[in-house]
Structure formats: C-alpha cells, structure tokens
Regions:
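Hydrophobic, Leu/Ile/Phe/Ala-enriched alpha-helical segments that form helix-helix packing faces
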Residues: 1, 21-30, 111-118, 148-152, ...
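Short, flexible loop/turn elements at secondary-structure junctions
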Residues: 15, 38, 75-76, 132-137, ...
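Plant-biased detector of terminal regions, especially N-terminal secretory signal peptides
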Residues: 35-46, 62, 70, 123, ...
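Substrate-binding/access-modulating region of protease and related hydrolase catalytic domains
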Residues: 134-214
C-alpha cells in the first residue's frame, strides 16, 4: 500500500477523546497507521525578532525587474511603511488575531534588505510575494500542506519560496517527514525551490554569522 496515496483523517480536540474512543478507532481494520499531526512554528520562544526598519529605509525603491521570492510565513501587514512597495502580491490564509505579522515582517525584511542587515548576504534585493499561511502560535502540518498547494498553484511564475519555520520536535532520523515529502512533490510538480530553515539555535554561546574559518 502506498501510504502517500491513502486518505488522511484529521482528528481535532484530542484532549477530549477518551481511551475507549481511541481504542475503538484504532481497532478499525481499514486504519493502517495513526500519527499525531505535527505543529509547525515560526520561531523558538525567547528569540528576539528585529524587523530592521532603519535598514529598509536606506535602500532604493524596488525595480520591477528584480526577482520575486514567496515568503510563506505570518505575513506582512498591509500598508507597512517600509515594505509595502516591495510586496508584489498577497495570498492570505490567516487573519488577525491568529497572526500578529511579526515574524513574517522580519523575514520579508531579510529578503528585501538582507545585505543591509547582514553584510554576508548578497547585495541583490528581491521583491516579495506575501503568503500569510502560518499562525503566530503554530500551525498543523496538514493545514500548511493545503495552503502551500494553493499558494504555489496560484502563482506558477514565482519559483522560490522561503519557509522560515520548523517543528516543535525533532525529525525522524530514518525517514522523511510527511511535510518534507509534500514539499518534494510540490517542487517536482511546479518547479519551485523551497528554502527551508534548518532550525533555531538557542543555546549559549550563540553562534555568530557568517561562520569564520576558525
């Protein structure tokens, strides 16, 4: 049985399920596998987010010939003083109060003015396709996969998609996650390059960037 083609059943409010209810479900002969739906978050608690408004104010207005990067995150608020002219379009799946736009604004700032904020970044700025697809407190993987499928199909001309997000638990060391498999399938179907964060490093001492030879 190809599990990637099997229908998925999403169970919500699991804290309200009794052991008898779960036993009854798991005893169904048509159920092959049951896994908890992973929650994906934009950043680790305690990590400060710097939007970089000063650096954005120093760069020239966007050129229509510059490339476009889809930023799939918590979104950029409409009318943002520094970023609004850089946003070429919006796909909105999440609205306030489920998003506060903080992390998405910070990531979009790096796409637009990365070199001004980090000298090791390329000098070439990019315009932004703002995809508000992530709740500020985290999203279920199944929701993210659906939103990504919709976003990619709506803008086939955008070939780079930034995903500065990660799971609250580590990945399985022996197999790719459902989310990773979905990204591979979307990449192969639409020719999109997904740039995915490797994780947040919160231990002391904090790592510097860019990495030196020593």
């Amino acid at each position: 049985l190809d599990e990637s083609q099997a229908p998925l059943l999403e169970l919500l409010d699991m804290d309200q399920w009794t052991d008898d209810m779960l036993d009854s479900l798991l005893s169904y002969p048509g159920l092959r596998r049951a896994d908890p739906t992973p929650v994906i978050v934009s950043s680790s608690p305690g990590i400060p987010i710097n939007v970089g408004a000063t650096a954005l104010a120093l760069i020239a207005p966007p050129d229509k010939e510059w490339p476009v990067v889809a930023v799939f995150d918590t979104g950029v608020p409409p009318g943002h003083a520094q970023l609004d002219s850089w946003v070429v379009g919006r796909n909105t799946f999440v609205l306030p109060p489920d998003t506060d736009h903080v992390h998405g604004t910070a990531v979009a700032s790096l796409v637009v003015a990365g070199h001004q904020l980090n000298a090791g970044f390329p000098r070439n700025p990019c315009r932004v396709l703002d995809v508000t697809g992530l709740e500020s407190n985290g999203s279920y993987t199944s929701d993210l996969i659906y939103r990504l499928q919709e976003a990619v199909s709506r803008r086939p001309d955008v070939k780079i998609c930034n995903l500065s997000l990660g799971g609250v638990v580590g990945c399985d060391e022996q197999e790719f996650s459902e989310f990773a498999q979905a990204l591979d399938a979307l990449s192969a179907k639409h020719g999109v390059l997904f740039v995915v964060a490797a994780g947040n490093y919160t231990d002391e001492p904090r790592r510097g960037w860019p990495v030196t030879k020593h």
